[in-house]
Amino acid sequence: MAGSLFDTSAMEKPRILILGGTTEARELARRLAEDVRYDTAISLAGRTADPRPQPVKTRIGGFGGADGLAHFVHDENIALLVDATHPFAARISHNAADAAQRTGVALIALRRPEWVPLPGDRWTAVDSVVEAVSALGDRRRRVFLAIGRQEAFHFEVAPQHSYVIRSVDPVTPPLNLPDQEAILATGPFAEADEAALLRSRQIDVIVAKNSGGSATYGKIAAARRLGIEVIMVERRKPADVPTVGSCDEALNRIAHWLAPA
């Protein structure tokens, strides 16, 4: 079809759409790009100003909710949808499950395993960023805020603390906090570097999301070594869809579902 994201000269190939934005999504796209059996594309939400290049055809921007995604899946004749978005991107995951149900397209979720506390960890588990704000308490603390920029505004109600805020892109609009430092950086972050950062800023508590994976685990390991508390925002219950924990598992599932009849 005109304007298609996919290769219109290869209509016989099953079309796979990856909903991306994670390291795992990019790795899966790279491996699928090397497989001539499939026609693969990836969609990014467009929340970062300078997204990394992808190894397959790329779409950037939202779909307009579950309705828009369902129309796209139908119009592009998608055979398989892979939800490889961030574990905390609950809205797009919900939309993907809804769109798959409406269209009858196969859907799998690629979710990196959660981190689990190890001996020496000082975790305070909370269910939301709002709860994390409350968990800081009233006493002034030196906080390393490592939850991304989208929900950082919640901490404006706790201006008594000192904040070091790390994100890929600047927090906009700027936070109304009297004592804050912004660090713009993209992982992976090594444990030694994270420990040096925590020491230099005299951090006594980290606020993090349980995103799993190795790229941002350095701060968790460094906190364990230094005896620093981590207020851990746990994941919400995922949508009830088939889920795999690695690219290898995803490729096996894809090969099974899209095997020639």
From Swiss-Prot:
The keyword Transport is annotated on this UniProt entry: no
Molecular functions (GO terms): precorrin-6A reductase activity
Upper lineage: Bacteria, Pseudomonadati, Pseudomonadota, Alphaproteobacteria, Hyphomicrobiales
EC number: 1.3.1.54
Protein name (database record): Precorrin-6A reductase
Gene: cobK
Organism (species): Sinorhizobium sp
Pathway named in the protein's UniProt entry: Cofactor biosynthesis; adenosylcobalamin biosynthesis; cob(II)yrinate a,c-diamide from precorrin-2 (aerobic route): step 6/10
Record field: catalytic activity: precorrin-6B + NADP(+) = precorrin-6A + NADPH + 2 H(+)
Family statement drawn from the similarity comment of this UniProt entry: Belongs to the precorrin-6x reductase family.
PANTHER family per the UniProt record, alphabetical: COBALT-PRECORRIN-6A REDUCTASE (PTHR36925:SF1)
